[in-house]
């Protein structure tokens, strides 16, 4: 298992190197600022273009995107669809357990930064009526995004695909902070769950035998 994990990290080394840089950036932010100050620091760099980009990009980390990825993989190989489904399911369960059971009382920016939102200090994109209140830690969208793009990178094996995947994952994770839906600590842990969980699932399942049907797809059922 350990050798398989190391092999997969080496296979998509660029993905994991960029991710390591992203983690180090988050660690610096988390040590340097309080969670509200970190949000205010990032918030000052807003722009109309980013408002539109992140508003729609954030949807790539939701349940429907993960479901679509599994559906598409069914047309490639059943085995790949199973790997993705297990990966998305395991990481989502871990995040939802932490979010809804352990850290259920952790408030979102709408509550923690109510004053700044209403005195004009904080630039917001999402309407107040659509802002979430509870279950801030960890970020479910970030978990999903890193799980989705980690699996796609590992399935591809091409380094440039891995680079594109980690860029998308990072941008989706950051969108949660940009849109004032989460704090940096939420996306930090969410990204860890999504990446490590998916790497472990992939490394465990990839060499399992599924019989001939595992190599088949919806395009080749005979």
Language-model regions, residue ranges each:
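Hydrophobic alpha-helical transmembrane segments
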Residues: 58-77, 141-146
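Aromatic-anchored segments of alpha-helical transmembrane domains
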Residues: 25-29, 89-97, 168-180
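Membrane-water interface at transmembrane helix exits
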Residues: 39, 74, 95-103, 153, ...
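Interfacial segments of alpha-helical transmembrane regions
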Residues: 10-18, 69-100
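N-terminal transmembrane-helix/juxtamembrane module of multi-pass inner/ER membrane proteins
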Residues: 1-68, 99-129
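Short helix-capping/hinge motifs at transmembrane helix termini and TM-loop junctions
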Residues: 31-34, 76, 102-105, 157, ...
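Membrane-embedded catalytic cores of phosphoryl/pyrophosphoryl-handling enzymes
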Residues: 3-5, 120-222
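Membrane-helix interface segments
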Residues: 49-50, 77-81, 157-163
